[in-house]
A protein has these predicted regions:
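N-terminal helicase ATP-binding lobe
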Residues: 1-811
Length: 811
């Protein structure tokens, strides 16, 4: 079917004042309307439906026309409290959850035999405790019946992606090696929790080092692409790959060269295909325009199964920096003046707040600054009004992190902020409360936290972000999940309207000073794919990037084609060093020779020194072009710092490490001491012979040495920045040393885990933090951890009681 979204028709309506003006007046400005007004709006909707139907018969899908008709009918129904037209529309166009909800809530004033009969026909669209739309049921069946080996499920957020994965898995029980690939560690945790409930006959693997080639014959892996690639290196030949959030494949930044995660995801698919010609692939995304845009160069086509009709209706408002409040009609493509002036942005935010409000900003620094201002504006809450579970959380965080951790006081007003520079274990623990606690009503976060996450959000305040409309659609889809809208506990239908408030604040600008108004305008019409990954068939490559693209394609092809007999560059790329250091051909020759000459055993405490010597010493600028963050390892001071950091990471609690770091900083009061924190929280640049950029990546401690609150909260961030650095940059370089037999597996384990005990490592690889493991070991709880026949961890009743009692205090 041809796609013509109907934008031109709607633009013609906008340009005819005799139609446009009453539509705008009745939909956006008049709170109460008459029956005559309603008749006019319904007549407009019928004309749109008629035009849509005529075009469908011609094979043209003008989807915006039917969407606008639905918007008009639903809005009118609520204004006049008469739901007959909405019920009839829902029955005729397969919006069955709405029709059933109208019946369940007794919203039809003149229920008759026809309503009873149509309601009974909806029963065949029941799926457990929910009702599917006509299109939803149809597409589910198409995906499950598709005999092709590359299939896509493209549907709005909350339309049953997780259920489809596990239904598809049930239909393929004969397959032994299954992988679900997700973009973030937080999403690993979420999918793992779902899998534990539904999968009982496989080993569930969330880390590549959980896998044993000799023991594990039936597995379900839930990993990022990095971990999945390491599983392939360990010999896993996947039978099925589920690519969650598949739109991530489209991304690419040529400044990062081989260090692009989309490249690794594409490599995983290509290697898995090479290992198993019968590989089944299921791509899942809420924000892909065409499935063909996911296709890798010179390879198989991907069938397109799409749910295009969304039950949720966007109510978009825009408060600009001057205080002008406007509404945006995404069908007419027009901002409509509310004729209201808002004196305070935060007063508006508080006034428009609901039960669970998401405040979105893209930079961690902005998140913390905004959260501080919001906290100051929120009304005071008496201690006796704070829920007991939140009081417990406050107490735990004060003990385990630090009493000066500013999130603690924010919790007392029902406010949480999270970003990727906060300790991972704390993030996951606090997210549990965001999901479960009604007291926590304000959640300030960015996409690092939200990617793919299911949270009970019912209101969105969008403050600042990137220009990508795909990410914006994905974010909006997180608000009011279908399961929440149509649950038995929800006594209203009005949650089909999704409140999206765009708030323009000068102190929290858009990425690259972009226009928030123009970003809103991108919500009109279909999603347009921006295909930047050079490995994809439909990639758009600028002339300035063509040589880089050719080199990347050649490198990736070589990795796949020579996988069993890789050359030096392929081994270096697969193990991780090349994506960080970008050696030239001359540099590769030097490095290869060094590796050949360094086969003698090295002591554990010399490993980081060896990293410096092998990868950095005596290389010239024309030999390599390392990323700045990894280039810091050429300095002996950095090496010594991370040796000490890793020792403390393996031996001390988070609370101890925070106190020690602040104590150390205070000892530097007489010197010009700057610490590296990266671009998210950096305040100054430090020019050296190796770095002359303008990025603010350092903090000058002399500017803050008398501000203890600042120091302790900076320490929390700094420790996570360094832990990420160890987990990524340093671990990739160590993985390369392991690949070339310069260190052995036991040395690698001692460095990363602080132990080479197989029993301890088996437990640490489950994703348990070092702090939790130390606490379990100290209290003799390790004996209460068991493994089932497939190797899945099980806790007995004693351990479950212990965990419930201690909570986050184990960290």
């Amino acid at each position: 079917m041809m796609t013509n979204d109907g934008k031109r028709t709607l633009t013609r309506i906008k340009n005819q004042d005799n139609i446009r003006n009453p539509i705008v007046e009745l939909l956006y400005k008049k709170i109460e309307i008459t029956n005559k007004d309603a008749e006019f709006l319904y007549s407009v909707a019928l004309l749109l439906i008629d035009e849509y139907s005529k075009e469908i018969e011609k094979g043209i899908d003008k989807n915006l026309l039917i969407e606008y008709a639905y918007f008009i009918i639903a809005t009118t129904a609520f204004k006049v409290s008469d739901f007959r037209a909405l019920y009839d529309f829902s029955i005729n166009y397969g919006y069955y959850p709405i029709a059933r909800k109208i019946i369940d809530l007794d919203l039809l004033s003149d229920m008759n035999i026809n309503h009873v009969m149509t309601n009974s026909r909806i029963d065949k669209f029941e799926d457990g405790d929910k009702i599917l739309t006509y299109q939803q049921k149809k597409v589910f069946e198409e995906v499950l019946d598709d005999k092709g080996n590359a299939v896509s499920f493209l549907a709005p957020t909350s339309y049953g992606k997780s259920e489809l994965i596990f239904d598809h898995l049930s239909k393929n029980e004969d397959k032994n090696y299954i992988g679900i690939v997700v973009p973030t560690k937080a999403l690993i945790d979420q999918v793992y929790r779902e899998a534990k409930k539904k999968v009982k006959d496989r080993k569930l693997i969330i880390h590549d080092q959980n896998y044993s080639k000799s023991e594990d014959k039936r597995i379900l892996t839930i990993t990022t692409q990095e971990r999945a690639l390491r599983l392939v290196d360990e010999g896993v030949k996947f039978d099925i790959l589920y690519i969650d959030e598949a739109h991530e494949m489209l991304n690419f930044d040529y400044r990062n060269n081989l260090n692009n995660r989309s490249l690794l995801l594409t490599r995983l698919i290509k290697l898995s295909r090479a290992a198993n010609q019968n590989l089944l692939e299921l791509y899942l995304s809420p924000v892909i325009g065409k499935a063909s845009n996911l296709e890798i160069r010179n390879s198989k086509t991907i069938s397109d199964h799409r749910i295009s009709k969304d039950l949720k209706i966007l109510n978009i408002s825009f408060l600009n920096s001057e205080g002008n409040l406007k509404y945006y009609d995404r069908y007419l493509g027009e901002f409509i003046d509310s004729e209201k002036m808002i004196r305070s942005h935060f007063d508006y935010i508080i006034e428009q707040s609901k039960n669970k409000n998401l405040h979105f900003l893209y930079r961690p620094r902005y998140i913390e600054g905004y959260a501080k201002l919001l906290y100051e504006k929120l009304p005071f809450i008496e201690e006796y009004e704070i829920d007991s579970d939140i009081k417990k959380l406050i107490s735990e965080l004060a003990e385990i992190v630090h009493p000066k951790f500013k999130l603690i006081k924010y919790l007392s007003k029902g406010l949480v902020y999270l970003h990727g520079k906060m300790p991972l274990i704390i993030r996951n623990y606090v997210l549990k409360y965001v999901r479960e606690s009604r007291f926590l009503s304000h959640f300030v976060a960015n996409s690092v936290i939200l990617a793919g996450m299911n949270l009970p959000i019912d209101n969105l305040f969008y403050i600042s972000g990137y220009s990508n409309s795909r990410d914006l659609y994905n974010l909006i889809g997180r608000v009011n999940r279908l399961s929440d809208i149509f649950s038995k506990e929800n006594p209203s239908l009005n949650r089909i309207f999704i409140p999206v408030h765009f708030i323009e604040m000068d102190r929290f600008p858009q990425n690259q000073q972009g226009s928030l108004a123009k970003k809103i305008e991108k919500l009109r019409g279909r999603i347009k794919d921006e295909i930047k990954n050079p490995l994809l068939e439909n990639s758009t490559i600028a002339t300035t990037n063509s040589l880089k693209a050719e080199e990347i394609i050649e490198t990736e092809d070589n990795i796949v084609n020579s996988y069993l007999t890789p050359d030096f560059k392929s081994r270096l790329t697969r193990s991780g060093a090349q994506q960080l250091l970008n050696y030239t051909e001359q540099g590769l020759q030097k490095l290869s020779q060094r590796f050949e000459e360094n086969q003698n055993y090295i002591q554990d405490d010399e490993i980081l020194i060896k990293v410096k010597e092998l990868f950095f010493d005596n290389f010239e600028d024309f030999d390599f072009s390392p990323n700045y963050s990894v280039d810091r390892l050429k300095n002996i001071a950095t090496i010594n710092y991370y040796k000490n950091f890793i020792y403390n990471l393996n031996t001390k609690s988070l609370h101890e490490r925070i106190n020690n770091l602040v104590f150390f900083w205070k000892s530097k009061t007489d010197s010009d001491y700057q610490i590296y924190v990266g671009t998210q929280f950096g305040e100054v640049t430090r020019k050296t012979e190796n770095y002359i950029g303008q990025n603010l990546v350092y903090v000058d401690l002399s500017d803050h040495i008398n501000d203890e609150d600042y120091l302790y909260n900076l320490a929390i961030i700094k420790l996570q920045v360094d832990e990420d650095y160890v987990s990524y940059e340093i671990t990739l370089l160590l993985n390369t040393l392991l690949e070339f037999d310069i260190i052995n597996q036991k040395q690698f384990d001692r460095f990363i885990y602080g132990t080479d005990s197989n029993e301890e490592i088996k437990i640490l690889r489950l994703g348990i933090s070092r702090g939790i493991y130390r606490k379990l070991k100290q209290d003799d709880m390790i004996k209460n951890i068991h493994f089932d026949d497939y190797g899945n961890v099980k806790a007995n009743s004693l351990l479950i009681s212990y965990v419930n009692e201690h909570g986050v205090r184990m960290i």
